[in-house]
């Protein structure tokens, strides 16, 4: 795409985002009502679509993993990976889950077990068992399949095929170069930008709410909209500086530090918390997750509170992962250059998912233990304070809470930092080194988006906007998968003794041994 087209993508996206921010600032109640009505319509009519789409995406990832294409290098043949395995995993984890994991790791299991439950009566052992398996389900390989397939598409076309790092460029084999360089390609890139801004702004909104509640819980700092705006402004300055410093200096360093701090809290709570209960909960949850894998993947209640639960949780999560897919996908692709498709899928699909399971088992089980044994009423705590309310009842709770707060702050920066880089790429003809002023512009827009989300309804408004933004981009993801499979099917078999020859039927391509051809 030419520079002029890229500028148009940038300005069109910027105008759309600005209109949304202005509308939300002037008419917050109307925006809240509008997004709620649209969300209800989507949940009622498209829940089946979200569930089937994410499951099909997972099947596609598994198919490619065991196909003949698995040995293809995402880069030049023989190229070494840019980052070591530990650094790679740290960046996957920090950018891919970030604040959301810390935000929900305690609140979600407690909610499933003692509030709005998916199946069984609240507070029963069956509800507690459901809590962990559904938490694993929402944060497991389904989520990482969505990230992984989009990341694989970008990595394959950018590093193996040499295409620009744009969503539209990945559809060239499907729709043609001319179409992708025209208005259609520009519209697709605008959709990707809007989805990314929405997805990351939602994360910033969650982060601001939890940081504010954490400061209030620990230090009695006022918890209000003004303080949340101040936190977003401070964070914007920090992640803008990080984005300015470059991906290697900024994101890699912060990701490594945060992975270490997150595991300090994890191991600390595992030791001082109900260790045996945590181990039993993890094992039981994993078994239930595997045993009910497909029933959870395709489950749609007939109505009432159970359907409301589906909308509030599964549909919300699937939409969140789809909204985050262009951002996380491009970033994962960027840091995965030089790895084979097999190594890539195994790493992206399974390693972070297992880490998420462990986090949910430790934090979620620790909270459930307090609630189930009537030691503390964690279920009454606000979503944003559930983690801090849990930690305070265990030894070293204040210290662990402080570290947790720091982890959230760093996740805040790394998520937004990565997003400014990706948005800069999408606005700079796929340039892997976008100009700093472009990244700063997107940083400011994401901050304003997050502020408006909080202003118009807090957590619920964030969830509604995610579900809305994900629907149009999900169609683009389907096209990206189709384009990838089409291009892979045209790959020459990885056998140096075979060459492509012209078949008698001009529409048929045939590979034969070069030795056989020479002999004939």
Where are these regions (language model features)?
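Long, low-complexity, intrinsically disordered cytosolic termini of multi-pass membrane proteins
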Residues: 498-520
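Helix-loop-helix module between adjacent transmembrane segments
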Residues: 2-4, 8-11, 15-25, 58-63, ...
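N-terminal alpha-helical transmembrane segments of multi-pass membrane transport
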Residues: 1-127, 267, 481-490, 514-519
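Hydrophobic alpha-helical segments of multi-pass membrane transport proteins
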Residues: 16, 49-66, 262-273, 355-365, ...
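Flexible loop linkers connecting adjacent transmembrane helices
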Residues: 34-39, 66-85, 110-134, 156-183, ...
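Membrane-water interface regions at transmembrane-helix termini and the short interhelical loops
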Residues: 1-4, 28-42, 61-80, 132-137, ...
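Membrane-embedded translocation segments of transport machinery
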Residues: 180-182, 192-339, 346, 351-402, ...
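Membrane-interface alpha-helices at helix entry/exit sites of multi-pass transporters
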Residues: 48, 85, 123-131, 179-190, ...
């Amino acid at each position: 795409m030419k520079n002029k087209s890229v500028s148009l993508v940038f300005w069109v996206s910027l105008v759309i985002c600005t209109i949304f921010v202005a509308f939300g600032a002037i008419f917050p109640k109307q925006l809240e009502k509008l997004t709620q009505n649209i969300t209800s319509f989507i949940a009622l009519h498209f829940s089946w679509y979200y569930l089937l789409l994410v499951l099909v995406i997972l099947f596609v990832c598994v198919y490619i993993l065991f196909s003949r294409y698995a040995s293809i290098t995402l880069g030049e043949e023989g190229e070494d990976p840019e980052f070591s395995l530990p650094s790679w995993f740290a960046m996957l984890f920090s950018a891919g889950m970030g604040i959301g994991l810390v935000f929900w790791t305690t609140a979600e299991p407690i909610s499933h077990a003692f509030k709005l439950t998916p199946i069984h009566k609240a507070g029963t052992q069956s509800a507690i068992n459901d809590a962990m398996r559904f938490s694993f389900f929402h944060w497991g390989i389904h989520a990482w399949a969505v990230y992984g397939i989009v990341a694989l598409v970008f990595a394959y076309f950018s590093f193996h095929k040499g295409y620009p790092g744009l969503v539209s460029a990945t559809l060239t084999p499907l729709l043609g170069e001319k179409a992708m360089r025209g208005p259609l390609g520009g519209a697709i890139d605008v959709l990707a930008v809007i989805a990314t801004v929405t997805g990351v702004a939602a994360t910033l909104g969650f982060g601001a709410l939890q940081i504010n509640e954490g400061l209030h819980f620990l230090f009695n700092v006022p918890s209000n909209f003004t303080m949340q705006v101040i936190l977003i402004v401070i964070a914007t300055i920090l992640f803008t500086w990080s984005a300015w410093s470059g991906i290697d200096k900024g994101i890699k360093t912060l990701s490594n530090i945060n992975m270490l701090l997150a595991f300090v809290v994890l191991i600390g709570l595992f030791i001082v918390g109900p260790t045996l209960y945590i181990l039993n909960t993890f094992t039981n949850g994993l078994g239930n997750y595997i045993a009910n894998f497909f029933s959870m993947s395709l489950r749609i209640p007939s109505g009432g509170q159970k359907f409301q639960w589906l909308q509030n949780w599964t549909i919300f999560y699937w939409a969140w992962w789809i909204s985050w897919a262009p951002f996380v996908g491009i970033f994962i692709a960027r840091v995965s250059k030089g790895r084979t498709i097999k190594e890539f899928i195994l790493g992206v699909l399974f390693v972070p998912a297992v880490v998420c399971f462990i986090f949910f088992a430790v934090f979620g089980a620790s909270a459930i233990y307090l609630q189930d044994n009537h030691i503390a009423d964690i279920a009454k705590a606000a979503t944003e304070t559930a983690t801090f309310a849990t930690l305070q009842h265990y030894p070293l709770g204040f210290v662990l809470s402080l570290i947790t707060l720091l982890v959230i702050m760093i996740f805040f920066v790394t998520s937004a930092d990565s997003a400014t880089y990706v948005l800069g790429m999408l606005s700079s003809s796929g340039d892997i080194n976008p100009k700093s002023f472009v990244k700063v512009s997107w940083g400011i827009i994401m901050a304003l988006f997050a502020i408006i989300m909080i202003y118009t309804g807090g957590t619920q408004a964030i969830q509604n906007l995610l579900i809305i933004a994900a629907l149009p981009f999900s169609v683009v993801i389907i096209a990206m998968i189709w384009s990838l499979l089409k291009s892979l099917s045209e790959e020459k078999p990885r056998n140096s003794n075979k060459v492509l020859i012209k078949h008698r039927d001009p529409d048929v391509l045939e590979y034969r041994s070069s030795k056989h051809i020479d002999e004939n």
